[in-house]
Regions:
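Basic- and aromatic-enriched surface patches that contact anionic nucleotides/nucleic acids
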Residues: 16-54, 58-173
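Aromatic (phenylalanine/tyrosine) cluster motif
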Residues: 1, 9, 16-17
């Protein structure tokens, strides 16, 4: 049972529960992003591609800002030997509809263990894109080309205004 970790987010922290033992550890969201950036947290290839749209990303950040629960994640502790026998991906930093809907292939390095996200990859990818990445979707009525073209798929970024209250004209984050 030491292979499974259930994670619960609060506004700025993550709680880890080792199953079945009640070993609890609290981490800040920033630490989770750092684990994703360092590729200590990876995605197994059996995970579906990233499918969340911009509204879902905004809703996730809205829930965090309001201190609403955003459910839990399940993490699989993978040894370097096991990681070498399976295929994994990194999380997506810059999402591009059609061209980049899964992360880059991951090759194990020197770590003794990696942590593969079994449940929660859409939310973690959204956090990573929201904090450090971009999101590009095709503009209407433009034709696809053979390669990524930013004029057809302009990058968008998430900005959080923490200095002012939302006014009546602001419907999204």
């Amino acid at each position: 049972y030491s292979m499974h970790v259930v994670i619960s987010f609060t506004l700025v922290s993550v709680t880890f529960f080792m199953v079945p033992r009640a070993l609890v550890s609290v981490r800040r969201i920033k630490e989770v992003i750092e684990l994703v950036e360092s590729s200590e947290w990876i995605l197994p290839t059996f995970q579906r591609k990233y499918v969340w749209d911009q509204e879902q990303i905004c809703d996730l950040f809205d829930s965090i800002m309001r201190s609403y629960p955003i459910s839990t994640f399940m993490i699989w502790k993978v040894s370097k030997a096991t990681a070498g026998k399976n295929k994994f991906y990194k999380f997506i930093q810059d999402y591009q509809e059609w061209w980049r809907e899964i992360g880059e292939s991951f090759t194990p390095k020197m770590n003794d263990y990696y942590y593969a996200v079994i449940d929660g990859q859409q939310r973690i990818n959204s956090l990573y894109i929201g904090y450090h990445g971009s999101y590009a979707v095709k503009l209407p009525r433009l034709h696809w080309k053979k390669a990524y073209d930013e004029s057809i798929q302009p990058k968008t970024y998430l900005y959080l205004n923490l200095l002012e209250d939302a006014d009546e004209n602001t419907s999204r984050l």
